């Protein structure tokens, strides 16, 4: 884990809990949060975690094994989520708004943590999340303050279209979700996405959302 905690008077009270995508490491999400805060005059506080499985020979890490089923994937995410929530149960973080943010596998992990710990997080930013197997999840009775921001590229073929549709419908049922889609973007991140996250967080006064699309 890499961390940066700003404690100066007037510092942003948000704490970002961040999870990278498959084959990457904790630096991926640090680059993302640095881009989100660039030019805002403020510095983010964050915990950026590295995946629990190292990728042999090629470097990088991931959060659950290749080819695992839905229940195993959920168990792996639950183990990470329980450990992280235990870590957050510290006076150091007591006054912080806690925001999950993850890309791909890390986006799915962020979603599972928000669902399994409904009172812990103020928001969850899900960047191109994997969503395989979540069709039976029903968030219509989701009693939580957590807001969701779901983001996909229109040309993302890494996450099947059916899984993207599942993500939109599952999150729409919570009544606390927003969705953005980026024309021509594959399984990646672009400038508009960074800008939309910035606006979702209230880091800019601009209230327009050029990438916004209906959730369902």
Question: Which residue stretches match the model-derived regions?
Answer:
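Serine-hydrolase catalytic machinery in alpha/beta-hydrolase-like enzymes
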Residues: 1-94
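Gly/Ala-rich beta-loop-alpha elbow adjacent to hydrolase catalytic centers
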Residues: 102-106, 110
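Hydrolases whose catalytic domains are alpha/beta-hydrolase-1, hotdog thioesterase
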Residues: 109-113, 135
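A conserved short beta-strand
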Residues: 119-132
């Amino acid at each position: 884990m890499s961390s940066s905690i700003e404690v100066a008077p007037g510092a942003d009270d948000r704490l970002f809990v961040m999870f990278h995508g498959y084959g990457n490491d904790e630096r991926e999400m640090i680059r993302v949060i640095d881009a989100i805060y660039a030019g805002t005059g403020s510095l983010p506080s964050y915990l950026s975690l590295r995946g629990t499985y190292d990728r042999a020979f090629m470097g990088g890490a991931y959060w659950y094994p290749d080819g695992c089923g839905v229940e195993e994937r959920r168990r792996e995410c639950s183990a990470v989520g329980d450990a992280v929530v235990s870590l957050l149960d510290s006076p150091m973080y007591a006054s912080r708004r806690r925001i999950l943010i993850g890309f791909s596998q890390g986006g799915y992990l962020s979603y599972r943590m928000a669902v399994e710990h409904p009172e812990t997080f103020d928001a969850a930013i899900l960047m191109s999340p994997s969503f395989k197997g979540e069709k039976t999840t029903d968030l219509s009775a989701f009693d939580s303050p957590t807001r969701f921001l779901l983001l996909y590229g229109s040309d993302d073929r890494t996450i099947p279209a059916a899984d993207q549709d599942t993500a939109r419908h599952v999150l729409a049922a919570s009544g606390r979700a927003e969705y953005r889609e980026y024309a021509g973007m594959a399984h990646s991140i672009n400038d508009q996405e960074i800008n939309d996250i910035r606006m979702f967080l209230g880091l800019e006064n601009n209230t327009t959302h050029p990438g916004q699309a209906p959730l369902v």
